[in-house]
Amino acid sequence: VYFTTGPDYMKDIRLVELKDGKIGVFSRPRNEEIEKKYGSSAMIGFAVIDHLEDLTDDVIFNATPIEGIFGKGEWGGCNQAYLLQDGRIGVIGHQSFSQPVEGEEDLAVYVNISFEFDPVTFEVTNQKIIGTRGCYPEGPSKRPNLRDCTFTSGIVMREDGKADLYGGMSDVEEGRITIAYPFSCPLN
């Protein structure tokens, strides 16, 4: 059922129910102001709404950028969000940067990341890389500059306490690897 439209060119809009019943909204603000202020072409933004009907393009567009996830020249987004038992949010996402290669087009490097986010204080903890292109099976690349790219699709929790991490490989195929449970706290 259709219920809203996000801002033009906005990717990585994800929702998560919070401990108090409100809804956390992740977005990916991307504009010249963001790049000038943070040195990153795209950040992860966060806002809280009371009801699904409150989700508008203005809420998504004006979500507060979360600082400290990306360094200068990096960008990324939230691909999946889980409420943790302690009220924080476990996030699976992607982190990206361009890597110069002599005599070639710069590589677009995308890695799979996880971190824990406090929706009250905006503190980011336990941030780590959970997968890179080299962790996945070998395969073709759509273009040479995408050979080191794995775009995070999401994770599926397993009964053995691990997780299956899915990622788009070099813009051509989908792969799966098994990783340790990425968060320091159980899911709610």
Model-derived segments and their meaning:
Residues 1-11, 16-73, 83-145, 158-162, ...:
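Beta-rich carbohydrate-recognition and catalytic domains
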